[in-house]
């Protein structure tokens, strides 16, 4: 595929778009439950009802958005502004809805409405945004650089999200809800600016670079009725979970991110109600983590290229798991008032969290390449929709669970001194809860085999299939065939649409089970 020249401005502008994804998520995950229960008069159960309602909405909106952005290219607006970039342009003024969530002393229905509104805006922007890298390049190293730029900018936004509330609380007073409103307003302005840069410095895959199968699918879409379109949506969404490497990717992604969501949801409570410190201290510790997350992301770029995503992922999971356990050990050892130790543990946690943030979004950009080899189509939007749905569902689910457990443990909203059982519950969630989820991601990563070498083989074989219009195992080496089969999870001759994965291929016979062959070179199979 011919691509435009990619320079530093393109990497940085694309990465800046995740100020919306990571910055607002960091602020929401670390502070929203605390804001609702401290400044808005909501009980933990009421707050979790808001998150639950948003997830019901997400179950429809996120996959629908992925489907829409994949198919928007046939419309006048899609042809004029791009099937992906139109929604980014539309979202620029809409990001200011984020600030409406952070107005204090309003009622339950106000907070429900504002949360749902921003949730839809977030989805409308993030789903097409996440598809842009595979639209712009097929190259593994360029994709890695795009991912590195994205996560680096994301960590910069997380640093701001961590420190800003504490600074504003110090200026405006620790009991002033306006601190959070002004913090959200800063993020709204920044997100609008960053999305403008994304619009100006990114592009979509030219139509002449589409495969024959993709063009055929595009033509078929224009003749579908509403019922047929909905049926197609269901088939396309469910087909993503039939791709083995995507299931493995989701396992690593959710293992790392849900662990962070659990940790984030309870960390401010840990500082305020277990350590008996001001919320500004929590802000400083979260800021320390965010700084080291940024450092970790920079280090992960060469590590993932050198050792592969899965081994790098396991290393940072161990770092974050040990630091989570250390917070509880400090308390029970009577050392929790030693601020230097808290800073040290937070720094180690930041190194682990930064790596966990980087690896899944780095590997995500290659999943559509595996899918193209299987289906003969480019379906980035569908995968982005599923990713956004699982991300937001995991965040809200973690916060919901924490809120319910806190309520059951005897937590009282607005009360500065909590029952002793609440402290032990907070410590249990912070350490054991985080470790259990991390362990799930660690185990899944043992089976993940996508790396620089296997992707290079996949890419060369995909180019061959594009030229031929079908998969022919006789024209490839035994080792290359084994690598592609390992990633795709089906026999080579069943690739490039010769299976029933996806709507376009739904009437074809299913691919037979893959028979394991001889051992591959360890360079290809390490994971």
Question: Model regions: which residues?
Answer:
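Membrane-embedded alpha-helical bundles of multi-pass transporters/translocases
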Residues: 1-524
């Amino acid at each position: 595929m011919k691509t435009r020249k990619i320079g530093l401005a393109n990497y940085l502008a694309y990465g800046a778009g995740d100020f919306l994804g990571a910055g607002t998520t960091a602020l929401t995950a670390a502070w929203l439950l605390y804001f609702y229960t401290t400044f808005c008069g909501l009980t933990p159960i009421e707050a979790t009802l808001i998150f639950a309602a948003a997830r019901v909405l997400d179950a429809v909106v996120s996959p629908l958005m992925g489907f829409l952005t994949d198919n928007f290219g046939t419309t006048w607006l899609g042809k004029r502004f791009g099937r992906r970039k139109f929604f980014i342009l539309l979202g620029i003024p809409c990001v200011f809805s984020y600030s409406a969530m952070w107005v204090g002393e309003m009622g339950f229905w106000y907070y429900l409405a504002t949360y749902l509104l921003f949730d839809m805006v977030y989805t409308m922007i993030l789903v097409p945004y996440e598809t842009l890298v595979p639209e712009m390049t097929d190259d593994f190293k360029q994709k890695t650089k795009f991912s590195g730029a994205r996560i680096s900018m994301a960590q910069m936004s997380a640093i701001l999200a961590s420190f800003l509330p504490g600074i504003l609380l110090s200026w405006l007073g620790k009991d002033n809800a306006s601190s959070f409103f002004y913090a959200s307003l800063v993020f709204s302005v920044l997100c609008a600016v960053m999305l403008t840069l994304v619009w100006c410095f990114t592009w979509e895959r030219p139509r002449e670079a589409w495969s024959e199968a993709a063009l055929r699918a595009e033509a078929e879409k224009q003749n579908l009725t509403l019922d047929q379109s909905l049926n197609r949506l269901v088939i396309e969404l469910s087909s993503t979970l039939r791709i083995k490497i995507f299931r493995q990717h989701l396992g690593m992604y959710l293992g790392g991110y849900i662990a962070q969501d659990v940790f984030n949801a309870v960390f401010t409570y840990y500082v305020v109600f277990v350590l008996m410190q001001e919320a500004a201290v929590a802000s400083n510790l979260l800021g320390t983590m965010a700084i080291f997350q940024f450092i970790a992301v920079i280090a992960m770029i060469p590590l993932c290229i050198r050792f592969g995503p899965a081994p790098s992922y396991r290393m940072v999971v161990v770092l974050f798991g040990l630091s989570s356990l250390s917070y509880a050990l400090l308390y029970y050892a009577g050392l929790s008032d030693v601020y230097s130790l808290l800073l040290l543990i937070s720094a180690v946690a930041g190194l682990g969290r930064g790596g966990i943030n980087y690896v899944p979004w780095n590997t995500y950009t290659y999943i559509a390449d595996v899918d193209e080899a299987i289906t003969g189509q480019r379906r980035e939007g569908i995968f982005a929709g599923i990713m956004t749905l699982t991300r937001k569902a995991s965040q809200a689910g973690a916060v919901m669970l924490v809120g319910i457990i806190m309520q059951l443990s005897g937590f009282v909203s607005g009360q500065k001194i909590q029952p002793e059982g609440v402290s032990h519950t907070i410590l249990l969630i912070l350490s054991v809860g985080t470790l259990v989820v991390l362990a799930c991601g660690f185990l899944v990563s043992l089976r993940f085999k996508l790396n620089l070498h296997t992707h290079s083989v996949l890419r060369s074989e995909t180019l061959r299939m594009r030229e031929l219009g079908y998969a022919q195992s006789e024209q490839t080496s035994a080792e290359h065939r084994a690598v592609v089969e390992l990633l795709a999870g089906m026999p080579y001759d069943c690739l490039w649409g010769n299976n029933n994965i996806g709507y376009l291929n739904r009437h074809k016979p299913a691919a037979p089970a893959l028979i394991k062959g001889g051992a591959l070179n360890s360079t290809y199979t390490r994971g």
